[in-house]
Structure formats: structure tokens, C-alpha cells
């Protein structure tokens, strides 16, 4: 984590992310479809069911097929479910105020709610790294934070100090093949998708106005290079073919987790 912090501080102080520094293989999005859903605020792809977990800031989170048909729903002891992610073989949900709880995918409670360390957090999106760290994005104050599995703070970054400021971060996903962090910034910010390396270097930014307004959630299906972005305005989820930023000359990425039902 010290290496991560040094890399981030280096980006902030030296402004390393310039057009000349970007690799030849840059972030690329190509829209493949869209469907309507009621206020999709947070997304997570589940390869076990070949579907999406969706939180919409209410008391219930739902699992839907990739066509938008509901498969099941879960509730928690939190006042609402603002963000959702998969942690191992279960779910981790957040209320948006720093509270979290673990549930089975059948909705059984695995433990009481717990709070993230470090004071109040306007948690908009959550993801779990390969090493078990909980990564959150917050928009008031504007932060990207790393916690251990129990909620202890490890590292926190002010995203306003990035070479390209991230002012209204909402959703976060991690590409398991690269470790890259994919974060959407809503329309009060830049209405963009940001891509960070696993070490915290800002790799790319893609404007999303061509596809929708007010992005809130993001999920990745690495087995098919598919990305899902939820837009609040219009209440739609847009699907994309997705190519991550890679160093020049890199071999194509191997497939990641895909549908286990087929």
C-alpha cells in the first residue's frame, strides 16, 4: 500500500498523465445495447448467475438477467442499499453513509452492520480487490479510499488533487485481469469514465455524453470484454464492448470470469 501511495502522490505532484505518456492501446468503448431499469445506482456482475446485482438507493437490491429480468432480491439491516459488490461467494452492501453489511446471495445476514473507519463517508461505490481490500469512492468529500476487510482505513486519496480531477465519483469496478479501477464521474462532475492502474496511476478518461447523462454505476463482465454503465437520467443501463488501456505491444488479455450457468 505504501507503493500505491507513492505512485498516487507522484501522479499528483508531477502530473505524469499527459497525452504523450498514454500507451498506444488506450481505453476504448463501443456501445452494444441498452435497456431501461428504475434508477440503477450501483451495479455488480455475477458470473454465477450471468446477471447483474443492482442497488437503487432503496431497501432492496435485485439480481437481474443481462436482459433485465428479475431473478431474486435481497434486503439488509441497513436503512438503504446504496452500493453493492461481490466479496468471495457473498455480497457486501453499503448504505452510502459509511455503514456496510455482508449477506449471502440468498439474502441471509452473515453478520451485523459495521462502519468504515476514518469518519463520515459519503460512499457512492464499492469494490473488493483481489487481496481482499475494500475500495470505495466518495463524492463529499471527494475521495478514493482503501480499507481492510474489517473496515480499517489503509490509504485515502483526495481525488480533487489528481492531474485530471475526479469531483463526483459514483460507481467503481475492478477488471480482475489487470487490476485496473474503472470509476464513473456523474454529470455534476465530468460525466466521464476514469481508468486507473492497480497502482493508482490515472491511465485514461472517456467522456460519456455520447451514451448518456449522469452515470451512477459500473460493472464489468471480463469473460466477454463487456462493460455495463448505469445512467440515472433516462434510467438506463448501457452495454459496451470494452478494451482497457494496455502497454504498447501487450498480448490480448485472457478471458476472465464469465457465465457459470452454461
Q: What is each stretch, according to the model?
A:
Residues 1-12:
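Bacterial N-terminal signal peptides that target proteins for export
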Residues 27-35, 69-75, 109-117, 153-164, ...:
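A short beta-strand motif characteristic of beta-propeller blades
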Residues 35-49, 77-88, 97, 117-133, ...:
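Beta-rich, blade/repeat-based domains predominating
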Residues 36, 45-47, 52-58, 92-98, ...:
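Conserved beta-strand positions in repeat-built beta-propeller and related beta-rich domains
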Residues 65-69, 104-108, 148-152, 196-201, ...:
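Short loop/turn segments that connect beta-strands within beta-propeller blades
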Residues 216-260:
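Blade-level signature of beta-propeller repeat domains, shared across WD40, Kelch, NHL, RCC1
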Amino acid at each position: 500500500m505504501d507503493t500505491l501511495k507513492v505512485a498516487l502522490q507522484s501522479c499528483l505532484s508531477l502530473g505524469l498523465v499527459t497525452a504523450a505518456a498514454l500507451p498506444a492501446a488506450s481505453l476504448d468503448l463501443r456501445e452494444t445495447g441498452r435497456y431501461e431499469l428504475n434508477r440503477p445506482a450501483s451495479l455488480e456482475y455475477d458470473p454465477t448467475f450471468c446477471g447483474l446485482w443492482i442497488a437503487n438507493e432503496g431497501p432492496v437490491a435485485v439480481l437481474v438477467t443481462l436482459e433485465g429480468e428479475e431473478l431474486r432480491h435481497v434486503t439488509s439491516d441497513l436503512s438503504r442499499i446504496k452500493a453493492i459488490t461481490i466479496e468471495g461467494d457473498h455480497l457486501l452492501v453499503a448504505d452510502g453513509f459509511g455503514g456496510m453489511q455482508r449477506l449471502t446471495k440468498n439474502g441471509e445476514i452473515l453478520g451485523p452492520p459495521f462502519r468504515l473507519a476514518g469518519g463520515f463517508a459519503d460512499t457512492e461505490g464499492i469494490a473488493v480487490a483481489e487481496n481482499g481490500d475494500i475500495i470505495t469512492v466518495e463524492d463529499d468529500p471527494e475521495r478514493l479510499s482503501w480499507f481492510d476487510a474489517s473496515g480499517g482505513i489503509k490509504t485515502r486519496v483526495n481525488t480533487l488533487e489528481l492531474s485530471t480531477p475526479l469531483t463526483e465519483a459514483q460507481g467503481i469496478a475492478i477488471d480482475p485481469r489487470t487490476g485496473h479501477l474503472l470509476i464513473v464521474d456523474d454529470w455534476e462532475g465530468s460525466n466521464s469514465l476514469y481508468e486507473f492502474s492497480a497502482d493508482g496511476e490515472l491511465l485514461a478518461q472517456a467522456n460519456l455524453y455520447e451514451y448518456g447523462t449522469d452515470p451512477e454505476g459500473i460493472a464489468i463482465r471480463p469473460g466477454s470484454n463487456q462493460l455495463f454503465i448505469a445512467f440515472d437520467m433516462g434510467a438506463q443501463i448501457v452495454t459496451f464492448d470494452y478494451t482497457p488501456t494496455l502497454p504498447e505491444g501487450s498480448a490480448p488479455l485472457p478471458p476472465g470470469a464469465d457465465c457459470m450457468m452454461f
